[in-house]
Amino acid sequence: FYDARGSALFEDITRLPEYYPTRTEQAIMAAHAPAMAQALGPGRTVIELGAGNCHKARALCTLIQARHYVAVDISEAFMQAAVAGMRQAFAHLPIDAVVADITGDWALPAQVPTARRLVFYPGSSIGNFDPPQAQALLARMRAVLGSDGALLVGVDLVKDAAVLNAAYDDAAGVTAAFNRNLLEHVNRLIGADFDPHQWHHRAFFNAAQSRIEMHLEAAQALEVCWRGGKRCFAQGERIHTENSYKYRVQDFV
């Protein structure tokens, strides 16, 4: 999903009226960030995973008087612009950028302090991993933190299915464009000839699995070719593109 256009489309999604996670998180942070900062203590190195536009870390870095800030994101072009803005806002704060898939092997620059690290993973992106994958990711975070580290992670909770479905299938079609953009990304990566206009966006809450599922559904019978291969899709056949798990507090803890 997260080429430069995918990242930009996701930023658009966060401003949609149907997409409750962003404004809910903003309200939580506005109400409770001072208490969080007091619990965390000053002088921490903030390591933000999936940093995006870096805006979420700004208030936190100010409140805890951050010693160092590291943005980690998979989209290099998008993140470099965001980090440039962060450096303007925090002229005296050491700032580093790491381009990485956080589910793979990645390392922090040598100059990043090892003591009093805070891994900051806001939003609800941990829900994009199935529970075993989420546990593995949390274990990676634990390894990054060290013995005196702390973790601040956002988790989306189970709620009414109508609210969930609307959040991932908005009336303006921005999430649909985000989903279809995956095909453009695949085209560039493997030389495929997916036509995004031949695919419908489908999103729904799977209550049995406690997750939103996003799919792309073939609008007609079609054939897709790529370097060294091809595949036929029947009308109505789906590609399962993303999950977003929703938790109950006791289940996540």
Predicted segments with their positions:
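Class I SAM-dependent methyltransferase Rossmann-like catalytic core
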Residues: 2-43
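Conserved SAM/SAH-binding beta-strand->alpha-helix loop
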Residues: 75-76
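A short glycine-rich, Lys/Arg-flanked "PGG" loop and its adjoining helix->strand segment in the class I
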Residues: 135-147
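Conserved beta-strand signature within the Rossmann-like core of class I S-adenosyl-L-methionine
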Residues: 144-158
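A short SAM/SAH-binding and catalytic strip from SAM-dependent methyltransferases
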Residues: 115-135
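Conserved class I S-adenosyl-L-methionine
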Residues: 43-52
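Substrate-binding/catalytic lobe of Class I Rossmann-like enzymes that use SAM or dcSAM, i.e.
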Residues: 157, 163-253
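Conserved SAM-binding loop of SAM-dependent methyltransferases across substrates and taxa
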Residues: 53-65
